[in-house]
Amino acid sequence: MAALGVVAMIAIGAGIYFAFFGAGPQVTYVTPDIVPINLSTTAPSDQPPVDLPSAVLLPVPFTPQAPLGNWAARQHTCEEASLVMVDRYLRGDHSGALIDPHTADAAINQITAWKPAVDLTIEQVGEVANKNLGWAYQVVPADRLSMKQQLALGRPLIVGVRTHGLGNPNYPGYSTHFEQPGWSVSHYLVVTGYDQADTYVLNDPGLTRGHGYHISFDQLMHAIDDLDQAYPNLNAGRVFLVLAPAV
């Protein structure tokens, strides 16, 4: 079968992203500016837009959690990779491109040194980002409206899942050791957008080609629930983390 075409155009900052993937319809994504988190008041600037865009895509740069290919030594660095992606986006890298592997690896090593444990709860991920990277954070219920609201505020979402729960057959052991301990593991990734078909876009650092993976809302919720059932020490329920500058 011939390869299907992909056409995309993006405007940096607040703008519009036109995308055509395969034989489906063209999707027109908007790219909102980042709205700071107001920690002292529910200021209007921190409230979700009244009219949500039908589709949002944030051009968050990507790195796998093993940017130099050393996966055996990078089994527990999904938190770091997720933070690297979001941190670079908040600091102005709206390229949506692959981060230089050596730059990403050095940043992952730095965040590893800051981690209080090998595997972190979502609250601990926020605390690491706040203490060491200077970002305000909020833990938000992972329902459709809240996810779309936060993305429409220009904030990527960091989500805790279990890998096989994502339904992505590219994960090791998906077809041979489905949902078995040691194969389907706790994991963090970044949600960068949504469209009118209730599809969400992921930057998944657990795969070398995890950039721009599309997943249904129900499948994403299943992956979150799967984490909570298999890893009760990380159980926070259906929630996600957002980072942004504080005002």
Residue ranges and their predicted role:
Residues 1-123, 163-165, 170-173, 196, ...:
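Active-site-adjacent structural segments surrounding the nucleophilic cysteine of cysteine proteases
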Residues 75, 79-87, 105, 122-126, ...:
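Extracytoplasmic/secreted envelope proteins and their assembly/folding machinery
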